[in-house]
């Protein structure tokens, strides 16, 4: 866990710089694409405890960087009177949705085991990694907020 935290620290710093310089949508595009690539790579390449020392910080950098971007973006899309509620809603709704993924992972793993697939957990985790592609699709409807005033009532 600490290894991922080291990576996440640098990932969050990086996305804030990218979001400030190039815009929120390009920063999230890069972050979600990196999440997908790195997560699939790690699940399919991690072979030893030694690999974890460099792969887990990489995974933390990619997967947790988006939270630095959320801290910039979410307050910029809600008017003042709804800002706290809106930000809280965005952060916490996803937690409820994410709760479905561990049982889904185990279900996929069991299905793949029953089909005789080699390394079923890696395959199941790889399939679920494509959830990051949903983030890329969601960017189609995400407004760019860089350089715009905060919304007011």
Residue spans for each PLM region:
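Transmembrane-helix signature of 12-pass secondary carriers
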Residues: 1-153
